[in-house]
């Protein structure tokens, strides 16, 4: 029971920011009905069953290639779903897709690698390039490893100082940019995630025939 409670705390820390980022990127482009379904599918990716054995959903444990494949798969599900009556399947797949795309910037060191390339005055978060090819393909790109039980305890304020002392620097506890309390890099991760969410939408706009795209946006 304590394990489930702790994991629930882990999952609840993130939805607020997934919701904000998704609305900021997509609100002008979807009906409210569609947007609510996309957001619901997005935040349900952090449900308890997805916390075990699904590193690809969150880009955890260096599952970079698996996370990329998951995004490609969900994109395929969107296209397949829109060939059938109804839009729900496409909205669910898109919500899942953008959750993983957003987690890429919060759970990998992409932001740190991008900032390391900058010289002079640091750029603003709004200037971050979310898909810089040499960084996406960099051998130095990695994501935080989950070390049980310390990584769970790191999400509990009372245990966080002790957990971080015991966790290695490559742990999720040290590397994640899930919330503002993770420092200034959170703003860069958030900005990159919003840009990536819009990119994924615009990619589908290019891929889908106009009538299918109109169904997808429900506008």
Which residues fall in each region the model found?
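N-terminal, motif-rich segments that launch catalysis or mediate targeting to/interaction with membranes
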Residues: 1-95, 100, 110-219
